[in-house]
Curated annotation (Swiss-Prot):
Other information: Bat coronavirus 279/2005 is highly similar to SARS-CoV (SARS-like).
Role: Component of the viral envelope that plays a central role in virus morphogenesis and assembly via its interactions with other viral proteins.
Similarity field: Belongs to the betacoronaviruses M protein family.
Any one GO cellular component localisation term in the record: virion membrane
Species name: Bat coronavirus 279/2005 (BtCoV)
Protein name, as recorded: Membrane protein
Length: 221
């Protein structure tokens, strides 16, 4: 290290040589999270990804706050304060949207930092909720050897005749209704169906399924 506190090129090379293996593992972890951590592929990696995303918000905010406190000069201090305010507002908006979505669906998936769109499927007397990256006009349902998959998510065993007549897609602002349209049985335990969006409004899910499966949403007053 030189007298002014900077490191030389040789010291930087030695540092990289010593930490090369660790850096490789870090990049490998990034690749695995970015390529395989999806809710409909690998649930374990997806949960790790969500935890990592949750931790990034307070860590990023803390970095900008510390940069403002221990500023190099007033210019960098002002930039750090501005960025801290922006990150704080973004973090606050995430919590507001998440709690609004939770009030609508009563699902912990509402706090997913990756998306605020949730698919809700009433099946076997309960509501199965899964995250979606975008809201579609048509949602397909595929049953392969008695196992239902919808929007890429595995929802367990189901027969084509037991498919719900309605499903919903919730956001922090709206709840969209999808009605069962065309369906076709293939063989004994396989088939496919399509759900078409026909209504959208400010509703919340009705978690009481003692009655009909069709009554899955209530108007928010």
């Amino acid at each position: 290290m030189t007298d002014n506190g900077t490191i030389t090129v040789e010291e930087l090379k030695q540092l990289l040589e010593q930490w090369n293996l660790v850096i490789g593992f870090i990049f490998l972890a990034w690749i695995m999270l970015l390529q395989f951590a999806y809710s409909n592929r690998n649930r374990f990696l997806y949960i790790i990804k969500l935890v990592f995303l949750w931790l990034l918000w307070p860590v990023t905010l803390a970095c900008f706050v510390l940069a403002a406190v221990y500023r190099i000069n007033w210019v960098t201090g002002g930039i750090a304060i501005a960025m801290a305010c922006i990150v704080g507002l973004m973090w606050l908006s995430y919590f507001v949207a998440s709690f609004r979505l939770f009030a609508r669906t009563r699902s912990m998936w509402s706090f997913n930092p990756e998306t605020n769109i949730l698919l809700n499927v009433p099946l076997r007397g309960t509501i199965l909720t899964r995250p979606l990256l975008e809201s579609e006009l048509v949602i397909g349902a595929v049953i392969i050897r008695g196992h239902l998959r919808m929007a890429g998510h595995s929802l367990g065993r189901c027969d084509i005749k037991d498919l719900p007549k309605e499903i919903t897609v919730a956001t922090s602002r709206t709840l969209s209704y999808y009605k069962l349209g065309a369906s076709q049985r293939v063989g004994n335990d396989s088939g496919f169906a399509a759900y078409n969006r026909y209504r959208i409004g400010n509703y919340k899910l009705n978690t009481d399924h003692s009655g009909s499966n069709d009554n899955i949403a209530l108007l928010v007053q």
